[in-house]
Regions:
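Bimodal "functional hotspot" detector
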Residues: 1-197
C-alpha cells in the first residue's frame, strides 16, 4: 500500500467519522425534542389576584360520589380568567398523585367564554377528554363536577357547554353526550343524588 492510498483511506475514514458524529448528534437532539413534547405540562402565569375561598365539587370514582371541598386560591378580578382559575384548581386535584378521579397530567382548560346571560362555554384540551376514564358513572361525575363547581362559584350561570380543542365533541369518553348544553338545575339534581350515595 502506497502512502498516497493510505492518505486517501485515512481522509475517507476521518470524514466518515465526522458524518457519523453529526448523525448521532442529530438523532440525540430529535429524541430529546420528542421526549419534551410527550410530557405536556400545564403552565399557569403567576396569579396577581387576591386569595379567595372557592367551592369545588370533586368526583370520587371509587365510591361513585361527589364531595364538596372548599379551597383558597388566588383569583383574578376578570370573570373569564377567574372561572378558568377555579376550574384549574379542580384539575389540579384530578391530575394529582392520589387523585380520586384520575386525569392525564396534561389535562387543561384552554379557555372559558361567557356567551350570553347564563351560558358559559368551557373549552378543554384533548388530553382532558382523551384521559377521561370511560364509563357512564365516571363521565357523569366529571361533567357534574365541572358544572356544579362553575355554578357554585358563579350563581349567574344557568347552562354550560363544553368544547374540546375549540370543537364540539359527540361524547366525553364514549358515553355522556358532550355535544349539548348542560342545564345547571338538572345537574344540581344529579349532584344531590351523587353526593348522598
Amino acid at each position: 500500500m502506497t502512502s498516497r492510498s493510505l492518505l486517501v483511506l485515512t481522509l475517507c475514514l476521518f470524514f466518515l467519522a465526522i458524518a457519523m458524529a453529526l448523525y448521532v448528534w442529530q438523532v440525540r437532539s430529535r429524541a430529546q425534542f420528542e421526549a419534551t413534547m410527550q410530557k405536556p405540562q400545564v403552565v399557569t402565569p403567576p396569579s396577581t389576584g387576591t386569595p379567595r375561598q372557592v367551592t369545588l365539587w370533586v368526583a370520587h370514582d371509587d365510591p361513585g360520589v361527589l364531595r364538596v371541598q372548599a379551597v383558597s386560591i388566588e383569583l383574578s378580578g376578570e370573570r373569564q380568567r377567574k372561572t378558568q382559575e377555579i376550574l384549574r384548581a379542580l384539575l389540579a386535584i384530578y391530575t394529582g398523585k392520589d387523585s380520586p378521579h384520575h386525569l392525564a397530567p396534561g389535562a387543561d382548560v384552554r379557555n372559558v367564554y361567557f356567551v350570553n346571560p347564563g351560558l358559559v362555554v368551557v373549552d378543554v384540551n384533548a388530553a382532558l377528554a382523551d384521559g377521561q376514564t370511560s364509563g357512564i358513572l365516571p363521565e357523569e361525575l366529571m361533567v357534574t363536577s365541572f358544572v356544579q363547581t362553575l355554578s357554585s362559584n358563579s350563581p349567574e350561570i344557568s347552562r354550560v357547554k363544553f368544547l374540546v380543542d375549540g370543537k364540539e365533541r359527540e361524547t366525553l369518553a364514549g358515553h355522556v353526550d358532550f355535544s349539548s348544553e348542560f342545564e345547571v338545575s338538572q345537574m344540581a339534581d344529579l349532584a344531590r343524588q351523587l353526593s348522598s350515595e
